[in-house]
Amino acid sequence: MRQVVLLFAFLCFAQTSNAQLFSKEKIRNLENEDKKRLSWGYYLGFNNMDFNFDYNEDKPDILVDKSVGFNVGLIGNLRIMEYIDLRLEPGLTITTRNLTYDESYFDGIEYTESDLMREVKSTYIYIPLLVKFSSKRLNNFKPFVVGGISTAINLSSNEKNPDDNSSGQFRTKTNMLFYEVGFGVDFYLAFFKFTPSIRGVFAINDEVVPDVDPNSPWTGNINSMKTRGVFINLTFQ
């Protein structure tokens, strides 16, 4: 994920350092792009998602092994006023997180090495409604900040699955709410607008579905489990 962040920073630096942006003879690409009431596009990106745990008892933390996931979706942009836009960005977000439990969670219980690990796969239909606050356009780029709320449906939640961790299945909730904040830069190229952005995403509601046994070593000590993560998206409009 560090390499992805460095790539994002390099793209921004390379574009803003381009002589065309600051030369006296400026060529303004897509001059009327921001005057459109409605505009459309799509995005591709990466995510790195974690869990934030709140525990009932003081035990060693559940470790989360994160992996780089994938984002893809569409964009609908409504111009509210000169520097404010309302954006709907429905898409698909896929990620996998592996949980590792300390042996102390299984005191007095027979267990195997596989019991100490659980895989949590998430496939979200992700629908954010965002407000974008832009600065004044400078030649062919325009920085902005963005924030809003999102609803998500986790197609891999297994919430209704009768099998729980006693059968090897870690269950999560299907319906989720998030808030997100971030920033990015619009680059006006010859034929389209290219926008790299980075965002922090934070779950509002608890995601864990408790096991049937209230004293389950996997969920009994979890008071809440909330997703948090970073999105890096590349947008084309």
Question: Which positions does each model-derived feature cover?
Answer:
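Bacterial Sec-dependent N-terminal signal peptides
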Residues: 1-25, 234-237
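Gram-negative (and chloroplast) outer-membrane scaffold detector with strong preference
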Residues: 25, 29, 34-38, 46-52, ...
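Extracellular loop and loop/strand-boundary signature of outer-membrane beta-barrel proteins
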Residues: 27-28, 58-63, 112-118, 165-171, ...
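Residues that define the transmembrane beta-barrel architecture of outer-membrane proteins
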Residues: 36-38, 66-70, 121-127, 141, ...
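Surface-exposed strand-loop-strand hairpins of Gram-negative outer-membrane beta-barrel proteins
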Residues: 47-71, 75, 174
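Outer-membrane beta-barrel translocator domains and adjoining extracellular loop/strand segments
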Residues: 52-59, 99-105, 156-164, 207-215
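Predominantly the C-terminal beta-signal and adjacent terminal strand-loop region
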Residues: 190-237
